[in-house]
Structures are given as structure tokens and as C-alpha cells.
Curated annotation (Swiss-Prot):
Keywords linked to the UniProt accession: Isomerase, Rotamase
Residues in the signal sequence: none
A single cellular component GO annotation: mitochondrion
InterPro entries referenced in this protein's UniProt entry, alphabetically: Cyclophilin-like_dom_sf, Cyclophilin-type_PPIase, Cyclophilin-type_PPIase_CS, Cyclophilin-type_PPIase_dom
GO biological process per UniProt: protein folding
Protein encoded by which gene: cyp6
Keyword Metal-binding: no
Task performed by this protein: PPIases accelerate the folding of proteins. It catalyzes the cis-trans isomerization of proline imidic peptide bonds in oligopeptides.
UniProt organism field: Rhizopus delemar (strain RA 99-880 / ATCC MYA-4621 / FGSC 9543 / NRRL 43880)
Protein name, as recorded: Peptidyl-prolyl cis-trans isomerase cyp6
EC annotation from Swiss-Prot or TrEMBL: 5.2.1.8
Length: 176
């Protein structure tokens, strides 16, 4: 994780239509290059439309599941409710590796429906989540905007249903 020139991406977040700030992430392309590239390209939208016919882009998608003390999940830009999404490689792609662990707040990891079912859905941790190690690929970490992440957590619930509409209003890659 000490490699130089790791890609950085951002999410601009709105809560109920009100701009609420930006989260910036570094992507661990040195450890999980395929997974990091999927997320980076979904932030930029550079791959055009996917199999679903929808843009391969996180812009204007929502965080559909937020559980305080656990994580915020988003990335379903096809259905919007956790049942959809797709990767830049097709609907899904295989688990790359589980080298990086779910140790800490602000880690980006792939949400999935079992082994080798990575698409576009991801989650951001609020705490250590070691029970996810070996099942979900960690591929990035927040480097700026932790107060925005705290705001997401405040809008979560035990059921996971957010108490507000949390939208990614813009996203992309930051060049140094």
C-alpha cells in the first residue's frame, strides 16, 4: 500500500438534494489492479454503456444500504436497490485476492453475492469488519472527506434503509 501514484477518485455527495461534501479515495492498484481499475473506470464513466444498456458510471446513483457501526453500500446504478449493477468486464468478475484486510474505518471493498460475483456494488466501512476477510476484496481507502462518511453513517438504520436520499452527484478521477 506504500506504492506511489496510486489512483485517486472522488464522490461528491448530496443528502436529500443538498450538496454535503466530497469523499476522496486512493485505490490499491498495486495489490488488486483489476478491482481498482473497475472502480476507477466506474467513477469516470469512460467505458460507455454496459450490458444493461445503462452507463457504466456511479454518477447519480445512490447509497441504498447504510448500517451504523458497519458500512455504507452503493454502486447499483442499474436497479438502485441492491439487486443490480455490473462491472466494466461484464456482469461480474472473479475475486482478485483477499490480501488486504477489513481493518479500519473508510475502507472500500466489493459487495458481492458469493464467490466470484463482483460487479459494481461496493461498501465503505465505518469500523473494523474482520468477519468479511476472505469473502470481500478490499481495494481502496478514504483519504479525505471522513466527515462526509460520518454523515452517511448518521443517515443509516439497523435495517439498512437510509433515512435520507444519499446520492453520488458527481465522481471521477483526480490527477496529481
Amino acid at each position: 500500500m506504500a506504492a506511489k501514484n496510486l489512483p485517486k477518485v472522488f464522490f461528491d455527495i448530496a443528502v436529500n438534494g443538498q450538496h454535503s461534501g466530497r469523499m476522496t479515495f486512493k485505490l490499491f492498484s498495486d495489490t488488486v489492479p483489476k478491482t481498482a481499475e473497475n472502480f476507477r473506470a466506474l467513477c469516470t464513466g469512460e467505458k460507455g454503456k454496459g450490458i444493461s444498456g445503462k452507463p457504466l458510471h456511479y454518477k447519480n446513483s445512490y447509497f441504498h444500504r447504510i448500517i451504523p457501526g458497519f458500512m455504507a453500500q452503493g454502486g447499483d446504478f442499474t436497479m438502485g436497490d441492491g439487486r443490480g449493477g455490473e462491472s466494466i468486464y461484464g456482469r461480474t468478475f472473479k475475486d482478485e485476492n483477499f490480501t488486504l484486510k477489513h481493518k479500519g474505518k473508510g475502507l472500500l471493498s466489493m459487495a458481492n453475492a458469493g464467490p466470484n460475483t463482483n460487479g459494481s456494488q461496493f461498501f465503505i466501512t465505518f469500523v473494523d469488519t474482520p468477519w468479511l476477510d476472505g469473502n470481500h476484496t478490499v481495494f481502496g481507502q478514504i483519504v479525505d472527506g471522513s466527515k462526509v462518511l460520518d454523515l452517511l453513517e448518521q443517515h443509516g438504520s439497523r435495517s439498512g434503509m437510509p433515512s435520507a436520499k444519499i446520492e453520488i452527484t458527481d465522481c471521477g478521477e483526480l490527477k496529481d
